Design a protein with these regions (language model features):
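Conserved beta-strands of PAS-like sensory domains
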Residues: 147-179
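A short beta-strand signature within small-molecule sensing/ligand-binding domains used
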Residues: 80, 117, 144-154
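Conserved hydrophobic beta-strand signature of PAS-family and PAS-like sensory domains
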Residues: 82, 90-92, 195, 202-205
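Extracellular/periplasmic catalytic domains that process cell-envelope and extracellular macromolecules
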Residues: 74-77, 84, 126-127, 146, ...
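Extracytoplasmic/periplasmic sensor domains and loops in membrane signaling proteins
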Residues: 56-72, 97-140, 173, 177-183, ...
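Juxtamembrane extracytoplasmic/periplasmic/luminal helical "stalk" adjacent to the first N-terminal
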Residues: 1-60, 68-80, 150, 178, ...
Length: 210
């Protein structure tokens, strides 16, 4: 009987760990799909403005119309926004730091030495659907601290621009963690079998017994 209990416990634990690993891997997939969707919406807007306005206005006016159309847009509970850079590494639109707009900064780095702008420019040269770049960027509520971020960009040929959006990976991981805990909370096996989850510091995160 004891051996059967141990085998059942091992099976349940293996199943829970497999679900955790599946969800962890899915987090990146979900974020990538969402970023692509956001940028595709922006590109439709940009292409429509360009097609309509370039017939009656000079390029500089059309650029300004596009920039100001994207500037106020927010998503991901206010964290997400659209940005535009040119392919030489100049900030064209950066709603969180408009003082940088117009500045040529091809060598800007994150706190781990990654070349942010160069990574975005390289990503913009990839085929549609592949233009992802990972880097670290300043947190909205902690302007002197950086955190991991993923961006997706597309190339806009008429102005030699890249247009993109990104988000910090931590909120997406936390969202998936909560989904995992809710799923495991409902698990019951045998007459009194429950699953308990704790963090590295021993704090109880969830027990399906309560």
């Amino acid at each position: 009987l004891r051996a059967q209990q141990q085998e059942r416990l091992q099976r349940e634990l293996d199943s829970a760990i497999s679900f955790l690993e599946f969800t962890r891997q899915r987090t990146d997939t979900v974020l990538r799909a969402s970023l692509r969707e956001q940028v595709d919406v922006a590109m439709q807007m940009v292409q429509a403005i360009h097609a309509r306005e370039s017939q009656r206005h000079p390029p500089e006016v059309v650029k300004r119309l596009i920039i100001e159309a994207l500037r106020p847009v927010r998503f991901y509970q206010g964290r997400g926004y659209y940005f535009i850079d040119d392919m030489q590494g100049r900030f064209i639109l950066l709603p969180t730091a408009p003082q940088l707009e117009g500045r040529l900064l091809p060598d800007n780095q994150d706190d781990r030495g990654h070349m942010i702008m160069r990574g975005l420019v390289e990503a913009a040269r990839l085929p549609d659907g592949q233009g992802f770049s990972s880097y670290r960027w300043y947190l909205p509520d902690k302007p002197n601290e950086m955190a991991d971020k993923l961006a997706y960009v597309r190339y806009f040929a008429p102005f030699d621009w890249l247009i993109g959006a990104g988000d910090y990976t931590a909120p997406w991981e936390q969202q998936q963690q909560q989904a995992v805990l809710e799923r495991l909370r409902a698990v019951r096996f045998g007459q009194s079998g429950v699953i308990t989850v704790a963090d590295h510091d021993g704090r109880l995160l969830m027990s399906s017994g309560r």
